[in-house]
Structures are given as structure tokens and as C-alpha cells.
């Protein structure tokens, strides 16, 4: 008899890779947005093991923001998602805080359950102003329009990707004790070139990779 109350989606990494590469191929082939929307909505409706959809967008500084929506709610309200833009630095003043999210079904991803939690999928959203026009501070949206214009006008395909850089601090919850210690301790002061097998930094790199 199973001990879990619900059977939420948890895909192995190999299957995640296959699904995400298939979605990437659709983007590469410029499959029509309405066709992608139809496919994704049907998938969400049919896949009973998905409980929530994480909608992502980025701010002016490139910081990633995530909003979790109950799947059933999102299926009914996919065209009417809003959020408070005044809570995002550089977006809107409080008196004009309402912004909208238009789901970019081409940017639909299956994420690892051990990172994002079981039963979830990810999709990026384009930020829209209150009148439905593209929001000028949505840098991802600006880049999408530039890329689309270059393809339509000149036949150019623009490729962009993020470069992951950062610092690894000791302690899983290091930020929660910063107000007491006033500092962060690095996991390793020698850099990743000098990290040996089994040390904390190398273990972190191997786990993430």
C-alpha cells in the first residue's frame, strides 16, 4: 500500500533532458505560438500528476522571480494573470502597481523535482503593462522582440544564454544567520581549479552539473 497521499510528477534526469530538448527543438523550428499553447494546455490538463505551474520572469537586473499557481486555477485564468509590479525594484510605483503576465508557452520547461519540488512544471511569462502592451522594463521581452524583428527583417537568428557565476558560502542556511555573524564564510578560498574530489566545493559542482 503506497504511503504517499498524492502521486506527484517526479521525472528522472534522463527523461527531463529528453522533454526539454524536444521543447527546444520546437523553439528552434519556430512552431506557431497558438499551436504550442494548445499542446501545453492539453498536456497540463491530461497530466494528473502535475499540481502547480511555476511562472517565471526577470527584473531589470536579471534577477529571476517565480510565482506558483495551482494548475486548475492557471488552466482557467491563463489569460488573466496579474502581479504587483511595485514589489519589483525598478518596475512600477505603488499607485500604478498592477502588471500582467502573458505566458510564453515556447519557454515551457520540466524542472528537477529535487530542486523545484514534485508535481511542478515551469513556464516563463512576458510582462505586460495594464493596457496589455509590452512592459518596457521587461528586458527579456525586449530581447525577444529584438530577436523576432531581426529574424523577420534580415533572416538573422540571435542566440543568447546565461553564464552562471557566483559564490558558494558555507552552510545551507548561511543567509539566515548573517544578521548575527555579519559575514559569509566561503566554502573554499582556493577556487574551483584547486578543489579536490570530495571537498564541499567539488561536491557542490558535481551535484549541480
Positions of PLM-derived features:
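ATP/Mg2+-dependent ligation/transfer catalytic cores
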Residues: 1-209
Amino acid at each position: 500500500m503506497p504511503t504517499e497521499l498524492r502521486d506527484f510528477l517526479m521525472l528522472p534526469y534522463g527523461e527531463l533532458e529528453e522533454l526539454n530538448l524536444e521543447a527546444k527543438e520546437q523553439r528552434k523550428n519556430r512552431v506557431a505560438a497558438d499551436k504550442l499553447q494548445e499542446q501545453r494546455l492539453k498536456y497540463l490538463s491530461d497530466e494528473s500528476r502535475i499540481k502547480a505551474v511555476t511562472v517565471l520572469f526577470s527584473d531589470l537586473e536579471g534577477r529571476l522571480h517565480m510565482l506558483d499557481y495551482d494548475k486548475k486555477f492557471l488552466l482557467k485564468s491563463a489569460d488573466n494573470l496579474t502581479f504587483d509590479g511595485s514589489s519589483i525594484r525598478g518596475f512600477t510605483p505603488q499607485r500604478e502597481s498592477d502588471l500582467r503576465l502573458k505566458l510564453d508557452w515556447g519557454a515551457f520547461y520540466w524542472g528537477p523535482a529535487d530542486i523545484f519540488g514534485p508535481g511542478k512544471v515551469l513556464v516563463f511569462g512576458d510582462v505586460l503593462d495594464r493596457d496589455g502592451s509590452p512592459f518596457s522594463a521587461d528586458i527579456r521581452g525586449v530581447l525577444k522582440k529584438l530577436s523576432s524583428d531581426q529574424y523577420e527583417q534580415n533572416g538573422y537568428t540571435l542566440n543568447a544564454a546565461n553564464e552562471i557565476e557566483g559564490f558558494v558560502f558555507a552552510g545551507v542556511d548561511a543567509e539566515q544567520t548573517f544578521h548575527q555573524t555579519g559575514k559569509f564564510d566561503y566554502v573554499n578560498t582556493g577556487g574551483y581549479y584547486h578543489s579536490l574530489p570530495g571537498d564541499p566545493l567539488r561536491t557542490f559542482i558535481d551535484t549541480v552539473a
